[in-house]
Design a protein with these regions (language model features):
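N-terminal metal-binding scaffold of metallo-dependent hydrolase/deaminase domains
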Residues: 1-50, 62-63
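Acidic, glycine-enriched loop/beta-strand segments at the rims
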Residues: 14-28, 295-296, 302, 360-376
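Alpha-helical scaffold segments that flank or form the walls of functional sites
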Residues: 32, 82-151, 175-188
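Active-site gating loops and adjacent loop-to-helix segments of metal-dependent hydrolytic enzymes
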Residues: 79-109, 157, 162-172, 231-259, ...
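Metal-coordinating catalytic core of metallo-dependent amide/deamination hydrolases
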Residues: 137-267
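Histidine/acidic-residue-rich catalytic or RNA/ligand-binding cores of hydrolases
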Residues: 232-243, 274-279, 296-305, 322-338
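His/Asp/Glu-enriched, well-ordered alpha-helical/loop segment
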Residues: 254-261, 303-376
């Protein structure tokens, strides 16, 4: 069925940090859609002439935006949103990790999976890169719930073998088997993708990181995501655990985990050298405004990332973040960058870009989602 949607249309088919003309806005716009694919986007009157026999859904008084894209969010942390007053490692120890141990119960995990996907959809998020659970069946429940909702999700089993609660630990051999199990389960689902996810370098031994490397080498369709440079204490701990590494990024690089399909969350305290190497390797950064503010982690050095042509998008980081709203994260980008060490003003076009196409570019999905270019 072909349909012409009439409403105000806003989207950014170009990088709004690179082009002043990136924002496409049409007060009386139209979007021609056929079987989920965009045929045309533009002025309603012109499209009505071009498609005279197509049925019209008149949404005058409303506006249409591309689906939002969340590049960093934790499925098992839905019910701990709002745990304020902590720094990162204390928050993990007191709130996040105790809650995540509950996902050993498949029934509990299935309940939260439904809450999670409804939370995404209710806030306009149609695509997300998601930290799954430490448990296979819980992560499978997330994939099933996302599929039933029609969301586009990249996720995977969260891997750790040290420094967390024992219940959350795996072994390299078990991680290898469990990841293959989940990859096979979602292989026939076009809107589901798999990410290799060591929780962060602190919680991953060299043998576990070798497993991550082997998984990525074996299957080029997989993504990689983890945390980096989120808090000063975290960085100090990584330095003590990997004394051979010149910086945090070097840990992931030594195991060949940083490439075009890699998304590194936070990067608040990155060195210029790390940002430059992220650019060279084609990786992306997930910028999590509300979480970094709520946990007192710091303000993302956006200007330094832009100066080095590093790719970045936004993530809500539920539950360190304060909710599912990607537009709220984009607004926070404007507010916090005014207060940054090297301040800058984020325009409305750039905010919309961060909430939509930037995430699509980070996930190499910009040929299918992120804006209203015909064919998407």
């Amino acid at each position: 069925m072909t349909e012409l949607l009439r409403a105000a249309i806003f989207h950014t088919p170009q990088n709004a940090f690179h082009s002043a003309a990136a924002l496409h806005a049409c007060a009386d716009g139209g979007l021609v859609v056929e079987r989920g694919k965009i045929l045309a986007c533009g002025d309603y009157a012109a499209l009505r002439v071009q498609y005279p026999t197509v049925g019209v859904r008149d949404l005058t008084g409303s506006f249409i935006l591309p689906g939002f894209i969340d590049t960093h969010i934790h499925f098992p942390q839905v019910r701990i949103v709002g745990g304020l007053g902590y720094t990162l490692l204390d928050w993990l120890d007191r709130l996040a990790l105790p809650e995540e141990t509950r996902f050993v119960d498949p029934a509990y995990a299935a309940t939260i999976a439904q809450e999670f996907v409804y939370g995404l959809a209710a806030h306009g998020t149609t695509t997300a890169l998601v930290f799954g659970a430490h448990f296979v069946e819980a992560t499978a429940a997330l994939f099933a719930a996302a599929s039933s909702m029609g969301l586009r999700i990249v996720s995977g089993l969260v891997l750790a073998d040290r420094l967390l609660r024992d219940e959350l630990h795996t072994t390299p051999d078990r991680a290898w088997r469990d990841c293959h199990d989940l990859i096979a389960r979602i292989a026939a689902s076009p809107r589901l993708g798999y990410a290799v996810i060591p929780r962060f370098a602190l919680a991953a031994s060299d043998p576990l990181l070798e497993v991550c490397k082997a998984l990525l080498k074996e299957n080029a369709s997989l993504f990689f995501t983890s945390h980096i440079n989120e808090s000063s204490r975290e960085i100090e701990t990584v330095a003590s655990l990997f004394p051979w590494a010149k910086d945090y990024l070097d840990v992931y690089e030594k195991f060949d985990l940083v490439g075009r399909r890699s998304v590194l969350a936070h990067n608040v305290h990155a060195t210029d050298a790390e940002i430059g190497r992220i650019t060279e390797r084609g990786a992306s950064v997930a910028h999590c405004l509300c979480s970094n503010a709520a946990l007192g982690s710091g303000i993302f050095p956006m200007r330094r990332h832009l100066e080095r042509n590093a790719r970045f998008a936004v993530g809500t980081d539920v539950g360190g973040g304060t909710g599912f709203g990607i537009l709220k994260e984009a607004l926070q980008a404007h507010l916090l960058q005014r207060l940054a060490e090297d301040p800058m003003i984020i325009t409305p076009a750039q905010m919309l870009y961060l909430a939509t196409r930037a995430g699509a570019e980070a996930l190499q999905m910009d040929t299918s989602v992120g804006d209203f270019t015909p064919g998407k």
